[in-house]
A protein has these predicted regions:
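N-terminal and secondary-structure boundary signal
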Residues: 1-372
């Protein structure tokens, strides 16, 4: 797609807030985010436990919100946004990851959780008109089949803008995850795991929908910490010191994928989005301003762990014939408990906790500890 631009900067803790301001201006963000509409700050919480590289960083929010306010965006038009998942508690996660402390504590912004604590109360939101059935104008690849009874999205999003806050990390289902995947946790309700079997097509459908309902779309990606391996949780974190921004969700993911060591067009969701004209997935066709990252290659690998292998058996393997029984009936809580039990009860105490302690000794770990 002609005109795709991604801004990339190297940063350090002493300058990261001002570097985010510089980054946003380099990416010409005001062209993508009108000042006369509300802006959903779509925060990423991939785990309620703090784990480096996993979720939106406090300095990412701090630098962007500060810039928005300094550039004349009205405080009342900005709000932090979270969505409920069946395996991650967003309300605990936004505190442990020091996100709420920035959004509410430092800047006093509205902070919205799109779904109630009790998942059984979701039907009330539909009855009250807070979540509405949406019929996309564009052709969808998979979501009509995933949700045959109707596709529901938050009503409040229609006519607003969205600003995504992903991090640079790998993912067991999509190889890498970034701006396009961040919408997965915004537009779909708590049963969005049903879409994992066709996750690549789902991300393309979600970008199609975003372009229909939002007045503006922009993404700011933090790669100060970056995660390699069986993401988005069970990763090996590294200090990488990069931040990225763009109004093209496909292009920013393509640049991030290239930096991690993946061929962007080999990733199905990037290729499909590029082919549909939703953005630019060809690295050589993207205008990169700031750092020259053409030779950057972190040699990240898309790997699996015990939990993800089990999930893939359900979505793509021997257990595929039983997918609906296992994930769409009354016995489904077994899957949530198994996931939480593995990641929270086994992997983190035995593996993850040590890695967090090591990362807390780094410059970004020390900065994280400085945030109250």
């Amino acid at each position: 797609m002609a005109g795709a631009k991604v801004a990339v900067l190297k940063t350090r803790p002493e300058t990261v807030i001002e570097d985010y301001k510089k980054l946003l201006h380099m990416a010409e963000y005001q062209k993508f985010l009108p000042k006369d509409t509300r802006i959903c700050l779509k925060i990423n919480v991939s785990w309620q436990i703090f784990y480096p590289g996993c979720s939106t960083t406090p300095w990412q929010l701090d630098g962007v919100i500060k810039t928005l306010l300094e550039d004349g965006y009205k405080k009342e038009n900005l709000y932090g946004c979270h969505n409920r998942t069946v395996v991650v508690d967003g309300k605990i996660g936004e505190v442990n990851n020091k996100q709420k402390q920035i959004v509410v504590g430092k800047y006093g912004l509205e902070n919205v959780h799109l779904q109630p604590e009790k998942l059984s109360e979701f039907k009330k939101l539909v009855e009250q008109g807070e979540w509405i059935r949406y019929e996309p104008r564009g052709q969808l690849l998979t979501l009509h089949e995933v949700f045959p009874e109707g596709l529901y999205i938050p009503k409040r999003f229609i006519g607003e803008s969205i600003l995504h806050f992903p991090t640079m990390k790998t993912h067991v289902f999509t190889t890498m995850t970034g701006a396009m995947k961040n919408a997965f946790g915004a537009l779909l309700h708590h049963e969005r795991h049903w879409a994992h079997a066709t996750i690549h097509e789902t991300l393309v459908d979600l970008l199609t929908i975003q372009k229909e309902i939002f007045k503006g779309i922009f993404a700011v990606m933090d790669g100060t910490f970056a995660g390699d391996g069986a993401g988005p949780r069970a990763m090996i974190p590294y200090e990488k010191d990069y931040i990225l921004a763009s109004g093209d969700m496909v292009a920013i993911d393509a640049v991030a994928a290239h930096m991690m060591g993946f061929d962007p067009m080999s990733l199905t969701f990037i290729r499909l989005a590029h082919e549909k004209g939703l953005g630019c997935g060809e690295f050589k066709e993207i205008e990169i301003v700031g750092e020259d990252v053409s030779q950057v290659n972190w040699h990240f690998k898309d790997t699996d762990n015990f939990a993800s292998r089990g999930q893939k058996m359900i979505y793509h393997g021997l257990l595929k014939p039983f997918e609906k029984t296992l994930l769409r009936t009354r016995i489904v809580p077994w899957a949530y408990l198994a996931s939480r039990g593995y990641y929270d009860g086994v992997w983190y105490p035995l593996v993850g906790k040590k890695r967090v302690r090591q990362m807390m000794q780094t410059k970004w770990g020390r900065l994280f500890q400085e945030y109250a």
